[in-house]
Amino acid sequence: MSLAFNLRVIPFSGHTIQSRRGLFPVHESPMITTKPFAAVKCSLTTSTDLMGKIKEKFNGKVHTSLPAITTHSADTPSNLCIIDTLQRLGVDRYFQSEIDSILDDTYRLWQLKKEDIFSDITTHAMAFRLLRVKGYQVSSEELAPYADQEHVNLQEIDVPTVIELYRAAQERVTEEDSTLKKLYVWTSTFLKQQLLTDAIPDKKLHEQVDYYLKNYHGILDRMGVRRSLDLYDVGHYKTLKAADGFSNLCNEDFLAFARQDFNISQAQHQKELQQLQRWYSDCRLDTLKFGRDVVRVSNFLTSAMSGDPELSDVRLAFAKHIVLVTRIDDFFDHGGSKEESYKILELVKEWKEKPAGEYGSEEVEILFTAVYNTVNELAEMAHIEQGRSVKDLLIKLWVEILSMFKIELDTWSDDTALTLDEYLSSSWVSIGCRICILISMQFLGVKLTDEMLLSEECTDLCRHVSMVDRLLNDVQTFEKERKENTGNSVSLLLAAHKDERAINEEEAITKAKDLAEYNRRKLMQIVYKTGTIFPRKCKDMFLKVCRIGCYLYSSGDEFTTPQQMMEDMKSLVYEPLTIHPPEANNVVGKKTELCQQLVKPYVCHTFCKKYTVSRPSNVMMTCYID
């Protein structure tokens, strides 16, 4: 098997993307500059040594003359490490077919209990995690020998090995899985103790352990990539049999490529923020005097979901709906009167613009026309993507969520007593996950039929992810909503036990978190299951949104009062990764050799110097170096 890049051309518009001094002053963020990026358009094939090394490491020894089940891969540990590294550095999308082939081979070896996998703890744990996440049927019982700490010789393993066991334990999809439950308990305890006693001398490894322990299921994809790039260290895999060969692959060239890929995505996210801000202003949402302005927050969250430049429309549709849902939710809560809130629902049901005087108030006009124009625009775009009209679906989703807002408004204003089930029956919709996902999914490159969108699977995916986000949100907003007499799941849990054994707030919060965890595992079961109605590409969106909920509400309300998010926003959207001169030279230094291969007119901008050259047919990516 050979590994080859298959990258798309990402045209560079030449627009300058500048920092926002008002939000992130230059003196506080030295990496941010008001100068435009120095554009580097180069062929990734210029780093020929790197390509050769990657191909060599992925070139499994497959004997095609023998039955498939006897396929032997002598380099399975290295292959798995490469896959893990590609994923952690955010460039795995370029190698997906090769990764799939290697995991197929790994699964065959797993079924045969081959020594390549089972003789090494790190390889064993990594194989389990990668295979389970991909949907292969692998039993956690195979990790039973490591489930109890007393059965593991800690003198013979190191912290990276325990990290791999810890990550494997996080893939528990059922409450009954005692093996992974016990594995999680001792590995998390061990790693926490290592941090407390400063027993990890390697600073990068210490920070990586701390990052995993803080909020593992709240690690957003692109934030995880940024952290991995900052803490990248090939020594993480030094215990493996193939460590020497692997370390030769993971050199500065490879890291430079991953950093450039990150900076390309970051430039795209900045462009999307500008588009989002123009849309916000065009909709006059910036003139509203109430509620939360979450434009930057929505841009950050959608950027953290995916860095693929091709998915710009997905991110923008999602971000716009985060903004719209938040603005209208705030209007229903405290920005407008009951009659004005009802009016918005009536207007959406009618779906017709009216003269300004018929809206009743300027706020109602602004909110309705923002929804009306945005949905109509997205419906036209989605018609092209899907090959059919989806406007009725989009309107239906808006009627649904506004109807839930109305139910909640009536309930709390009339002081109606609710059970927890009654509350959750509407609040899982009003959290907004369903409408944001199903509308943005129209631009994912997958044809979505009515059968798919109306299926029980779709409902279950939406409900489980929404329940996670709703319950975790309730835990963090419980005190505020109790003062406002609006109530949430925590207050309802407290009320439900008044006539039984009374529970305190801490116990009620624990119950709410347990229910959120139950729904998270249910979501994982559907996402990891193969042969379902939705392709994995679609189901992954639900998992990404679940991580957003875990990120936002793990220790506070980061959505309403962002604190950690502000630091993360700087590193993801504003601060480019440094491409050190030696690394840059490794990637773009062979421009002369490249220019000799030219076949089509092209302009190569290298460190602000322009060379009019031709473009070889295999140049598929634009790299920006700051």
Swiss-Prot record:
Its cofactor is Mg(2+). Keywords: Chloroplast, Lyase, Magnesium, Metal-binding, Plastid, Transit peptide. Mg(2+) 3 binds at residues 473, 481. InterPro entries: Isoprenoid_synthase_dom_sf, Terpene_synth_N, Terpene_synth_N_sf, Terpene_synthase-like, Terpene_synthase_metal-bd, Terpenoid_cyclase/PrenylTrfase. Highly expressed in roots, and, at low levels, in stems and leaves. Pathway: Secondary metabolite biosynthesis; terpenoid biosynthesis. Gene3D superfamilies: Farnesyl Diphosphate Synthase (1.10.600.10), Terpene synthase, N-terminal domain (1.50.10.130). It is found in: Plastid, Chloroplast. Mg(2+) 2 binds at residues 329, 333. GO terms for biological process: gibberellin biosynthetic process; miltiradiene biosynthetic process; terpenoid biosynthetic process. GO terms for molecular function: magnesium ion binding; miltiradiene synthase activity; terpene synthase activity. GO terms for cellular component: chloroplast. Mg(2+) 1 binds at residues 329, 333. It catalyses: (+)-copalyl diphosphate = miltiradiene + diphosphate. Involved in the biosynthesis of ent-kaurene diterpenoids natural products such as oridonin, miltiradiene, eriocalyxin B and nezukol, known to exhibit antitumor, anti-inflammatory and antibacterial activities. Catalyzes the conversion of (+)-copalyl diphosphate ((+)-CPP) to miltiradiene. Abietane diterpenoids (e.g. miltiradiene, abietatriene and ferruginol) accumulate specifically in the periderm of roots. The ent-kaurene diterpenoid oridonin, main constituent of Isodon rubescens, accumulates in leaves. Belongs to the terpene synthase family. This is Miltiradiene synthase KSL1, chloroplastic.
